[in-house]
Curated annotation (Swiss-Prot):
Protein species of origin: Homo sapiens
Taxonomic classification: Eukaryota, Metazoa, Chordata, Craniata, Vertebrata
Obligatory cofactor(s): Zn(2+)
Catalytic activity annotation: P(1),P(3)-bis(5'-adenosyl) triphosphate + H2O = AMP + ADP + 2 H(+)
Function of the protein: Hydrolyzes extracellular Ap3A into AMP and ADP, and Ap4A into AMP and ATP. Ap3A and Ap4A are diadenosine polyphosphates thought to induce proliferation of vascular smooth muscle cells. Acts as a procoagulant, mediating platelet aggregation at the site of nascent thrombus via release of ADP from Ap3A and activation of ADP receptors.
Residues annotated as glycosylated: 155, 166, 276, 386
UniProt name for this protein: Bis(5'-adenosyl)-triphosphatase ENPP4
Keyword Hydrolase: yes
Residues annotated to bind Zn(2+) 2: 189, 193, 336
């Protein structure tokens, strides 16, 4: 009974808090540090990020989508869709119908992005709201004829400080107000490719810089008076795994390059056959024991990577740490793109703000779950998506959430309370029961004679 009262009272308080703050427009800043592997948090020191986490929430592993590349996963974060659904299926793509090509240097055609509606477009279309972006993939493209009110054209030479200055200026002073903003930074991905994630000396230096940037971000938000009312999510698109020159898969040793066109290379190679598809497949399937070769229709269902015309007829997937090359060596000591079930491919998520609990840790969510959570925070109606809002409820202060250990504890506690109450009721009933009054045995008149003569 006491437990029920407490739960009801907590619900009323939560509801009151939610209602009392509803007059303030919710604001959300989404930050991505490209290639931030989840276990970097355990293997390196991050004083600024750990302070951020102590005052907010941490999701230790975010299971991203296959293929675990930059453009596809950044679009999954903001649409809640698998790659086959939102259409950005790789960093390099080819559309057989239009004959168009997509790459990181040729990504401005809305054709590639229009199969989905990212959250900044949905937010931008609301009354008295606007969106802002500092180089998040796709934000400098007019998607469904809509672009953010404030954005920066992508230029990797622009410093983090300049990007941060613009984003905080737009969040602090714009009309209509910026209620959703994104900020993207290329590290630690670039250094992860160069050194490999197991290079402690170099990665320690790089990750310290990342932590300092997070400290700068928090300090700037506090200085501008944005910190207490702004929801901030820090996450990434993928992790990184160690590669080496002795783990190469040379396609030229297996098949003549004139038999196919290579759309995307490693570690997931997209093959467009120029001759009979089956013949190309048969030549490739025995190329290496460290590479899986799939016809498009045979790609495992768990990848959600079949139902899009931009996915090529044959897909090659290298084992973790192996690199697919064309008769040449690889300069990369780190890479990503591999099977999304691998922990090395997973990023993390940390969040702080009025929408989030404080000091809460959660083991895992899916990257597509971030989108419905962000829509909830901003009060937006989400477009159809592959995410599950229930997976993120435990992170949010306005949601009642219970996990399995807590459920077991509540059941056991409830049974103990009920048992104690039952015992108390029985004891009280026994104490309060009225005893029968004492009375002498009444004898009949003829019973006055003695029984023994």
């Amino acid at each position: 009974m006491k437990l029920l009262v407490i739960l009801l009272f907590s619900g009323l308080i939560t509801g009151f808090r939610s209602d009392s703050s509803s007059s303030l427009p919710p604001k959300l800043l989404l930050v991505s540090f490209d290639g931030f592997r989840a276990d970097y948090l355990k293997n390196y020191e991050f004083p600024h990020l750990q302070n951020f986490i102590k005052e907010g929430v941490l999701v230790e592993h975010v299971k991203n989508v296959f293929i675990t590349k930059t453009f596809p996963n950044h679009y999954s974060i903001v649409t809640g869709l698998y790659e086959e659904s939102h259409g950005i299926v790789a960093n390099s793509m080819y559309d057989a119908v239009t004959k168009k090509h997509f790459s990181d240097s040729n990504d401005k055609d809305p054709f590639w992005w229009n199969e989905a509606v990212p959250i900044w477009v949905t937010n931008q279309l609301q009354e008295n709201r606007s969106s802002a972006a500092a180089m998040w993939p796709g934000t400098d493209v007019p998607i469904h004829d809509t672009i953010s009110s404030y954005f920066m054209n992508y230029n990797s030479s622009v410093s983090f400080e300049e990007r941060l200055n613009n984003i905080t200026m737009w969040l602090n002073n714009s009309n209509p107000p910026v209620t959703f903003a994104t900020l993207y930074w290329e590290e630690p991905d670039a250094s992860g490719h160069k050194y490999g994630p197991e290079d402690k000396e170099n990665m320690s230096r790089v990750l310290k810089k990342i932590d300092d940037l997070i400290g700068d971000l928090v300090q700037r938000l506090k200085m501008l008076g944005l910190w207490e009312n702004l929801n901030v999510i820090i996450t990434s698109d993928h992790g990184m795994t160690q590669c080496s020159q002795d783990r190469l898969i040379n396609l030229d040793s297996c098949i003549d390059h004139s038999y196919y066109t290579l759309i995307d290379l490693s570690p997931v190679a997209a093959i467009l056959p120029k001759i009979n598809r089956t013949e190309v497949y048969n030549k490739l399937k025995n190329c290496s024991p460290h590479m899986n070769v799939y016809l498009k229709e045979d790609i495992p269902n768990r990848f959600y990577y079949q139902h899009n015309d931009r996915i090529q007829p044959i897909i090659l997937v290298a084992d973790e740490g192996w690199t697919i090359v064309l008769n040449e060596s690889s300069q990369k000591l780190g890479d990503h793109g591999y099977d999304n079930s691998l922990p090395s491919m997973h990023p993390f998520l940390a969040a702080h703000g009025p929408a989030f609990h404080k000091g809460y840790k959660h083991s895992t969510i899916n990257i597509v779950d971030i989108y419905p959570m962000m829509c909830h925070i901003l009060g937006l109606k989400p477009h159809p998506n592959n995410g599950t809002f229930g997976h993120t409820k435990c992170l949010l202060v306005d949601q009642w959430c219970i996990n399995l250990p807590e459920a077991i504890a509540i059941v056991i506690g409830s049974l103990l309370v009920l048992t104690m109450l039952t015992c108390l009721i029985i004891i009280m009933q026994n104490r309060l029961s009225v005893p029968r009054p004492f009375s002498r045995l009444q004898l009949q008149e003829d019973d006055d004679d003695p029984l023994i003569g």
